[in-house]
Design a protein with these regions (language model features):
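A short acidic, helix-capping loop that chelates divalent metal ions and anchors anionic groups
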Residues: 79-82
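Conserved acidic
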Residues: 4, 8, 16, 36, ...
Length: 145
């Protein structure tokens, strides 16, 4: 909630089974469905109103930024089934990646090392290391110096 300091949130997630590294800042309004299915590395920044829908494991590497309003969703329903049964796959966001404002990461996706998912993107397939997903296209980017 609004009265829970950002540096206290990692501690609370650990109590409920998350693995959270050192130097992690979690802003207000972040939602985590199943804390025991969330792992966050060191020195990460999780922006306001980020939503981890983690029916399956979500692993966030170190030095990752997940910007405001992003949704990281490891499960959904099989629309081809009359009963809409649930189907889920794990998600990995590797070290140094940046998931920008209002991006949506779907089940089974890996975001590569030091890669960028641009604002508003819907990530349906994995993004390789040192790449940028922008307007649905994956472009190579230089490694950080």
């Amino acid at each position: 909630g609004p009265f829970c300091p950002s540096l206290l949130r990692p501690f609370l997630l650990r109590i409920f089974g998350s693995q959270v590294g050192r130097g992690v800042l979690i802003r207000r309004g972040v939602k985590v469905h199943f804390p025991w299915n969330l792992e966050i590395g060191n020195t990460c920044w999780i922006g306001e109103e980020v939503w981890f829908i983690n029916h399956e494991r979500i692993v966030v590497g170190s030095d990752v930024c997940i910007s405001q309003g992003a949704i990281i969703c490891s499960g959904g329903h099989n629309y081809r089934s009359v009963s809409l049964e649930f189907q889920h796959k794990p998600i990995q966001i590797k070290d140094g990646a940046w998931v920008c404002l209002d991006a949506k990461v779907l089940p089974g996706v890996t975001i590569g090392e030091c890669s960028v998912v641009s604002a508003g993107e819907i990530v349906r397939k994995s993004v390789p290391d040192y790449s940028m997903l922008i307007v649905g296209e994956i472009l190579p980017i230089d490694p950080p110096k």
